[in-house]
Amino acid sequence: MDINTDKYKNITRNLEREMINLNPIQRGGILPTESKKIIYEYWDGYSVCDYCSGRLDQIETPPINEFLEDMSKFLGMDITRPTHGARESKYAVMNSICKEGDYVVLDGNAHYTSYVALERAKLNYEKTDIEEYPTFRVIPESYAEKIDMLEDSKKNIGLILLTHVDGNYGNVADVEKVGKIAKSKGYPFLLNCAYSAGRMPIDGKKLNVDFIAASGHKSMAASGPCGLLSINKKYENEVLETSKVNVLKELQMLGCTSRGIPILSLMASFEHLIERVKKWDLELEKTRKVVNELEPLGFKQIGEKPRNHDIIRFETPILDEIAEKDKRRGFFFYEELKKRGIGGIRRGVTKEFKMSVYGLTNTQVDYVINSMKSIINELR
């Protein structure tokens, strides 16, 4: 067999070690030092299963069972299971409580994985309305309108889904309003918290939520792939139904899910998560400072104002103007940031970009702001 494996040796990544990373999909998943230590203990395959009696969520050493109970308290829910990510959590709900052909009513900012999950579960969807440019906020009242429309058409509704914080604009949806609508209409309510649980405080019961889909690698300082599904006890029998062949194994989990470093890294980061969500107001202060400092340069923040989440989306006509005369064209901004030790902005993009300063120190935030100012002022 003629295979050269040299390219797979000594693979390295220096973005986090040597640069300030502004990628919003990565800021919430950065591991604290104490969580990195656990990797050396559990990097072998199935090492988490040393003392397993057949179910991942029941393992006592390491204390996965206690961790899941504590995570339920943290999220304000009753029962929690580990998954491989928020998308798998959403699919588990759809595939268990909905019938083939049912409709999922979901927001206009829903992540593509919500559509992939419902399509895989052989479901239909009805998308609710959002505000127009430049805010793009979810309109809660549209849920009631779409539900009424489907009911009038004799269509079966299986689930109401809301994206708590969308990845395009970083808008925080009004969960309580949508939750009240779902409850009054009598439909189960799933909240996609991929960009919120672990970054900001969440209380599922206060929000009238039946299910929470969370992402460990996106927002809970965990290695990927890792996620969580938290549910209300009311749906335990449906969502956590066990196999007829192997009565221990839960069908929607395919027996066991995150069985290695990802779940252990999430456990090791739990104390860090508990503490950091208490400082959410400070994160918003840093985010709003970035917007306030950069908009006078010719940036325009898209989405709700003031910012209620760390994701920032800027339209940047000033960068487009510079790109027209710079010999590096659209790559100049990426290269100038890289010179200054800043990464995470997509290469070749000048019309708009997304960023986040979540978890950065105030000194780092000021450095990012001043670096962008210097780039614009030097090249405009």
UniProtKB/Swiss-Prot annotation:
Q: Which SUPFAM superfamilies match?
A: PLP-dependent transferases (SSF53383)
Enzymatic class: transferase
So what EC number does this one have? 2.5.1.73
**Biological processes annotated in GO:** translation
Q: Per its database record, what is this protein's job?
A: Converts O-phospho-L-seryl-tRNA(Cys) (Sep-tRNA(Cys)) to L-cysteinyl-tRNA(Cys) (Cys-tRNA(Cys)).
The record's family statement is: Belongs to the SepCysS family.
Q: How does it assemble?
A: Homodimer. Interacts with SepRS.
Do you know which HAMAP family this protein is assigned to? Sep_Cys_tRNA_synth
Instruction: List the protein's name.
Output: O-phospho-L-seryl-tRNA:Cys-tRNA synthase
**Where is the organism placed in the taxonomic lineage, from the top?**
Archaea, Methanobacteriati, Methanobacteriota, Methanomada group, Methanococci
